[in-house]
A protein has these predicted regions:
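Conserved P-loop
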Residues: 1-71, 114-125, 135-138, 147
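Residue-level preference for the first positions of well-ordered beta-strands
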Residues: 4-6, 32-34, 77-80, 105-107
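Sequence-level detector for tyrosine residue identity
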Residues: 8, 24-26, 76, 109, ...
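A residue-level signal for conserved active-site and pocket-lining positions in enzyme catalytic cores
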Residues: 19, 82, 130
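Short glycine/proline-enriched coil/turn segments at helix->beta-strand junctions
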Residues: 29-31, 74-76, 130
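Conserved P-loop NTPase "ATPase switch" module shared by AAA+ and STAND
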Residues: 73-87
């Protein structure tokens, strides 16, 4: 039985690298996984996912996945979503449909909360509906476990 996974972590915890490695592992075993990201993620261009360590791969947009008929989605062995915090409720509902009705695993990677520790919309719904929730751990610049993100400007940390 397929499951919906939400793997979250602070910035710099290798979420994107993990997503790319999972897709590679599927491909290496002769399986077909699709990488997707929301259109609001423009960091690396429209149809590419890149990690800070230099890994990259083509992807589709979640919005394209929304338009895809179920029969085409059934051609995938796994759906892997990067930057899932930027998804909206209906997109997360689509992931639930893919898992529950099409029996295809969906693995979502993203931030849990913003710099004010407020949940992103996509993360909120993934935390509510995911079958498996996993934290990807990393270390903060201070040496302790990284649990949240900070936003900086020329004067230091922004708190509002």
């Amino acid at each position: 039985m397929a499951k919906l996974f939400f793997r979250y972590g602070a910035m710099g915890s290798s979420k994107t690298a993990n997503a790319l490695m999972v897709e590679y592992n599927y491909r290496e075993r002769g399986k077909k996984a699709v990488l997707a990201k929301p259109k609001t993620d423009t960091r690396d261009g429209r149809n590419i996912i890149s990690s800070r360590i230099g890994l990259s791969s083509p992807c589709i947009l979640v919005e394209e996945l929304e338009q895809m008929p179920d029969e085409k989605i059934k051609g995938y062995d796994c759906v892997i979503v990067d930057e899932a915090q930027f998804c909206n409720k209906s997109q997360v509902e689509l992931f639930v449909h893919i898992v529950d009705d099409l029996n295809i695993p969906v693995i979502c990677y993203g931030l849990r909360a913003d710099f004010k520790n407020e949940l992103f919309e996509g993360s909120m719904w993934l935390l509510a509906w995911a079958d498996v929730i996993e934290e990807i751990k990393t270390v903060c610049w201070c040496g302790k476990a990284a649990k949240c993100n900070a936003r900086y400007d020329k004067n230091g940390i922004i708190r509002k």
